[in-house]
């Protein structure tokens, strides 16, 4: 996959400028040096039972309370502190079948029903729920199915940076959740 392919995916959303504007298109944490990706989408080793399982998102390692940003415009459909595998987590509905999930947060500053804009700070990195270390678990869900988030990072990466993120994200490793 190249950034051109990700761009073509975004063009496949054509039919509505709003659809493109509101689809997730940026990384959910600052990753200027591209060193934050701890685990990518796909089959990974579970850190708890060491079995191979589908990892439905990407893990970004970061210090506690690193800001987490909304990947696009949307409405908060869940801001939950219940004790689940995701720990403290947020779900944003972006419309057009897109939902993003931000998990294992230390805290969040949004509530259900709130409208957010791309780049708004919505929470802070933590280690809650079924987690083996400080990180953000990030998922992109399209029409009810988890898809590889890296394909939606076309909004804030150069083609060279995109290639590097893609290279890092496909490496076989252990997820943090």
Please identify what each model-predicted range represents.
Residues 29-172:
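Catalytic cores of peptidoglycan-degrading enzymes
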Residues 176-177:
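Short, solvent-exposed mixed-charge patches
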Residues 7-9, 25-26, 79-80:
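Short, flexible, glycine/charge-rich loop motifs used to bind or transfer phosphoryl groups or to couple energy/partner
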Residues 3-20:
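Short, small-residue-biased leader/transition segments that mark boundaries at the very start
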Residues 1, 19, 133-135:
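Intrinsically disordered, low-complexity regions enriched for glutamine and histidine
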Residues 2-3, 21, 44, 76:
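Generic preference for well-ordered secondary structure
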Residues 1-2, 119:
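Short hydrophobic/aromatic segments of transmembrane alpha-helices and their interfaces
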Residues 16-17, 21-30:
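Long amphipathic alpha-helical scaffold segments
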């Amino acid at each position: 996959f190249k950034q051109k392919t990700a761009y073509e995916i975004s063009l496949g959303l054509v039919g509505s400028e709003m659809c493109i504007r509101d689809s997730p298109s940026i990384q959910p944490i600052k990753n200027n040096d591209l060193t934050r990706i701890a685990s990518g989408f796909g089959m990974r080793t579970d850190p708890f039972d060491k079995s191979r399982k589908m990892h439905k998102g990407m893990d970004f390692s970061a210090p506690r309370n690193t800001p987490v940003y909304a990947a696009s415009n949307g409405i908060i459909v869940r801001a939950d502190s219940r004790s689940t595998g995701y720990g403290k987590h947020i779900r944003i509905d972006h419309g057009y079948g897109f939902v993003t999930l931000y998990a294992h947060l230390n805290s969040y500053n949004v509530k259900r029903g709130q409208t957010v804009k791309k780049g708004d700070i919505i929470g802070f990195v933590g280690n809650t729920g079924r987690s083996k270390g400080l990180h953000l678990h990030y998922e992109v869900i399209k029409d009810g199915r988890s898809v590889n988030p890296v394909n939606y990072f076309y909004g804030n990466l150069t083609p060279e940076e995109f290639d590097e993120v893609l290279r890092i994200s496909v490496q076989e490793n252990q997820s943090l959740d």
